[in-house]
Amino acid sequence: MVDENLYRIKKYSDDTAFSCISKHFITLKDEEIKANNQHLHNVVSQGLIPLMKEDTLFKDIYRNIKYEGSYFKGTKVAKPDEYDLNLSMKLPLNYNELQVETNHKHFSYVKIKVNSESKLPKWEEHSKILNKWLSDKNYLNQNKFHQWMEAIMTNTYKKLKKSDNFYELEVDGKNYRIKQFKKSGPAFTIFVELGDHPTLMSMDIVPCLELNDIILQGYKTFPDVSPSKCVVAKPISKEPEGEFLWRLSFYEQEKQILSNSEVSKLKVVVKMIKKLRDQLNYKPLASYYIETIFLHEIAKRKSDVDFFRASKTSLFIYMLQKLIQALEKKCIPYFWHEGHNLIGHLQPPVIENYANRLKNILLSIDKKIVDDRFAMAEFLLNEEEKKNLLEIVESSKTNGSDTQNLEKSEVIKKIKHVINDGKNKENQNSFATIVTHAIIDRKENDLERRIAFVCEELKNLGQMKEQIPLADLNKLSESFKIMFS
């Protein structure tokens, strides 16, 4: 049972380590984000979409690009080079006359029935193609829709100049090299290179159909969240009527929920849980499953401002417990319809292994965190990233941080020893304090907190007094004379 007030526990109130890990090993670089967003716009909006619009049906039903996935939700951990894009389309139909069926065993899917009364004049204009998408009972066939979109993609590629195994696309003076698209479920995956550089980015382009604000029986609604939703042509294996089942997407609503001014503070915690997942190589534990656990908690805590303003460390510990609890129950209910278990397809032994490993990690962090602020780094960072913690300190010479007078001392030398063998607990505690000291930003910490850190480090230095060379002791003495003269 998870303690619902765990986030109030004092020993988790210090965010020093959390902030360090987030800043240096999780936060995406602004320059990369800006550059890749421009490349994305060039390739898709300015390059491919105009060519697709040469097909008259596509031109008439295409609405816009919806940028999806964890990157655009603000919960992505890895390098910003993988993107999910929905090509949003709206069929020429009167949506008030559409029949959307949700009363079947696949809770995250719907069947769409197109009545003759719902067809608008534009439907008749394109009836030669559109009528082929309907079954004898007028259900919309997602497989035929997807085949049509594949033909659009193929014809678009034919309009590009081919060179070896690539297709060339020039936009705004930049020469992009695009590989032949690959089909992956509902997506068409494209790999893009710029000039002679290796793969710049990959994008999953997913065609989807808008459902507007149609109310779906049994599904959640939120008064402050847009009711607009869409469906994608995601196939279901071993299902007799699979070609008529469309997968629901509530991405826009989820993005809106996570963008709330208070709720958005949880995004970095989502990323930290994903970072742990990646470090443990738990690939079957999809990002969406983790985000869903957060969505449930957000809905439950929507009026609890204190929760969203709690320390990120305490929220990380709390949400990690929530994840463990869900894995122990072998169930992560779909946020929009809890009749669907997102991890129901995973093998029980796999889920049990994940839960047990995460419990051991949580116990270890909980045991050590009072004495070692960086206890979580042991599980969140790989060996290379752990070495980079040392570089944070050593770079103080050039970045002007508070450790610029300590980089030559014996304490800093002992940091290297701690990183190499991790055997000396006393030095580990000092290491945590030194790294903490190295990452403090003057603009983000008040005077009282800064003094507290200095006092703590002085206490550690006092315990090691006999090991500190006389020259370094003299440096400390001179520093205090200058400060208090």
UniProtKB/Swiss-Prot annotation:
Protein's organism: Trichogramma pretiosum (Parasitoid wasp)
Catalytic reaction(s) noted: GTP + ATP = 2',3'-cGAMP + 2 diphosphate; GTP + ATP = pppGp(2'-5')A + diphosphate; pppGp(2'-5')A = 2',3'-cGAMP + diphosphate
Key word Metal-binding present: yes
Name listed for the protein in its UniProt record: Cyclic GMP-AMP synthase-like receptor
EC top class named in words: transferase
Annotated binding of Mn(2+), by residue: 298, 304
Gene3D superfamilies xref list: 1.10.1410.40, 3.30.460.90
Cited function: Nucleotidyltransferase that catalyzes the formation of cyclic GMP-AMP (2',3'-cGAMP) from ATP and GTP and plays a key role in innate immunity. Directly binds some unknown ligand, activating the nucleotidyltransferase activity, leading to synthesis of 2',3'-cGAMP, a second messenger that binds to and activates Sting, thereby triggering the immune response via activation of the NF-kappa-B transcription factor.
Domain of life from the UniProt record: Eukaryota
Gene Ontology terms for molecular function: 2',3'-cyclic GMP-AMP synthase activity; ATP binding; GTP binding; metal ion binding
Cofactor(s) annotated in UniProt: Mg(2+); Mn(2+)
Transmembrane segments: none
Residues bound to Mg(2+): 82, 84, 204
Keyword Magnesium on entry: yes
